[in-house]
C-alpha cells in the first residue's frame, strides 16, 4: 500500500489572449501573467500478490485525485476601460483504475501471461469565461449550455500472450491486445465569436470512442549465438465512433 500527498503553491507564468473592452476580439494581444497555483494532488496505490507453484497474479488499485483550489483568475485588460477579464485555471479531476495481471506455466516450455485493467476518469469543474462581455465582442455569444463539462472517460485494456520454447533453437509466440477509450461526456453546442469579432461560430465538443485490436503470431529461430531469424504476422485494427453529436 502506498499513499502520496503533494501540495503546490506559488505562481506560474501563463500566456493567453486579452483585448481592450469594448473592442472586438480581433484586437487581441498576448498577455503573459503569473497565474496563482494552489494544487493538491493525492495518489493511492494498493496491491495484493499471489504466487503459486506454476502461476502468479497481482490485483491492484490506483487512484489519482487532483484538486485546484482556484477556478478562475481575473485580471485587468491591457487597455481601455478598467474592465476585468477571466482566465480559467486547471480543472480538478479524479482517476480510478483497477488492474489484474498474472501468468501461468503449463510446462517448462509453454507459458502464458496476461493483464486486465479498467479505469474511470472524471472532471466536472465549473466553466470560467466572460459571458458578460457579449455582445461587445466577448467570447461567448450565448451562455454555455451547461455550467461544467461533466466529463467522464472509461478506459479498458486486455492483453494475453502465449509463448512456447518448441525446441532449443525455435521459440513460438502468439499475442493479443485490446484497448478501448470510451468518452462518455455529453456533446453540447457552444456558440462564440470568431476571431474577426464580426462572425459567430457554433461548435460541439465531440466525445469519441476509440477501440484498438492488435494481434501477433511470431516465430524466432536461432541460427547461432549471434544470429537469429524472426518471422511474424501482425494485425492492427482501430475503430473510431461518436455515439452522440450535438446539432
Residue ranges of each PLM-predicted region?
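Hydrophobic, lipid-facing positions within transmembrane beta-strands of outer-membrane proteins
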Residues: 42-46, 94-100, 156-160, 213-217, ...
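Residues on the lipid-exposed face of transmembrane beta-strands in outer-membrane beta-barrel proteins
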Residues: 1, 46-50, 100-104, 160-164, ...
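Post-signal-peptide, soluble extracytosolic/periplasmic N-terminal scaffold domains
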Residues: 1-56, 61-64, 74
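Transmembrane beta-strands of outer-membrane beta-barrel pores
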Residues: 3-9, 52-56, 63-67, 118-122, ...
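Short sequence motifs at beta-strands and strand-loop junctions characteristic
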Residues: 36-40, 90-94, 150-154, 207-211, ...
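Outer-membrane beta-barrel strand-turn architecture
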Residues: 51-54, 94, 104-108, 164-170, ...
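Outer-membrane beta-barrel translocator domains and adjoining extracellular loop/strand segments
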Residues: 11-20, 25, 29-34, 70-78, ...
Amino acid at each position: 500500500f502506498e499513499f502520496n500527498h503533494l501540495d503546490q503553491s506559488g505562481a506560474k507564468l501563463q500566456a493567453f489572449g486579452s483585448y481592450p473592452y469594448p473592442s472586438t476580439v480581433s484586437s487581441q494581444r498576448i498577455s503573459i501573467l503569473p497565474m496563482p497555483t494552489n494544487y493538491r494532488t493525492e495518489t493511492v496505490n494498493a496491491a495484493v500478490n499471489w504466487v503459486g507453484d506454476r502461476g502468479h497474479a497481482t490485483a491492484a488499485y490506483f487512484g489519482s485525485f487532483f484538486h485546484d483550489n482556484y477556478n478562475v483568475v481575473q485580471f485587468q485588460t491591457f487597455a481601455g476601460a478598467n474592465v476585468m477579464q477571466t482566465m480559467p485555471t486547471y480543472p480538478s479531476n479524479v482517476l480510478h483504475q483497477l488492474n489484474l495481471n498474472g501468468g501461468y506455466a503449463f510446462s517448462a516450455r509453454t507459458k502464458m501471461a496476461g493483464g486486465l485493467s479498467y479505469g474511470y476518469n472524471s472532471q466536472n469543474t465549473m466553466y470560467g469565461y466572460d459571458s458578460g462581455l457579449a455582445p461587445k465582442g466577448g467570447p461567448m455569444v450565448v451562455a454555455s449550455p451547461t455550467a461544467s463539462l461533466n466529463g467522464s472517460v472509461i478506459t479498458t485494456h486486455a492483453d494475453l500472450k502465449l509463448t512456447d520454447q518448441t525446441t532449443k533453437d525455435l521459440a513460438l509466440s502468439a499475442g493479443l491486445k485490446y484497448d478501448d477509450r470510451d468518452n462518455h461526456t455529453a456533446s453540447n453546442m457552444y456558440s462564440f465569436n470568431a476571431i474577426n469579432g464580426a462572425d459567430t461560430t457554433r461548435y460541439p465538443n465531440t466525445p469519441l470512442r476509440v477501440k484498438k485490436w492488435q494481434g501477433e503470431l511470431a516465430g524466432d529461430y536461432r541460427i547461432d549465438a549471434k544470429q537469429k531469424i524472426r518471422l511474424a504476422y501482425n494485425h492492427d485494427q482501430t475503430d473510431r465512433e461518436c455515439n452522440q453529436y450535438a446539432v
